[in-house]
Curated annotation (Swiss-Prot):
Name of the protein in question: Small ribosomal subunit protein bS16
Lineage, broadest ranks: Bacteria, Bacillati, Chloroflexota, Chloroflexia, Chloroflexales
NCBIfam families: S16 (TIGR00002)
UniProt-listed PANTHER family: 30S RIBOSOMAL PROTEIN S16, SMALL RIBOSOMAL SUBUNIT PROTEIN BS16M
Annotated source species: Chloroflexus aurantiacus (strain ATCC 29366 / DSM 635 / J-10-fl)
Any one GO biological process: translation
Pfam (any one): Ribosomal_S16
């Protein structure tokens, strides 16, 4: 199964994350298929950048987002409150 999840990068106690599409059997920071964005939670304000078209594509072909990624996708209006994909505007 393919998952959309966070891949941890950054320094000790200064995490940053890449939002990646990866096989569910791969380790958290291991091999991935594609990077579709990044999230910097330690910056003020927090930085979130997602390629919405690629996220919609992967969701359309059956990739399952993790709980945290679902929240991030809702922030950038890729998913609605029910977790359904919003068509491009």
């Amino acid at each position: 199964m393919v998952k959309i999840r966070l891949r941890r990068t950054g320094k000790t106690k200064q995490p940053s994350y890449r939002i990646v599409v990866a096989d569910s059997r791969s380790p958290r920071d291991g091999k991935f298929i594609e990077t579709i964005g990044y999230y910097l939670p330690t910056r003020q304000p927090k930085v979130l950048e997602i390629k919405a078209d690629r996220a919609r594509y992967w969701l359309g072909v059956g990739a399952q987002p993790t709980e945290v990624v679902v929240k991030l996708l809702k922030r950038v209006n890729v998913l609605d409150e029910q977790g359904k994909v919003i068509a491009e505007a």
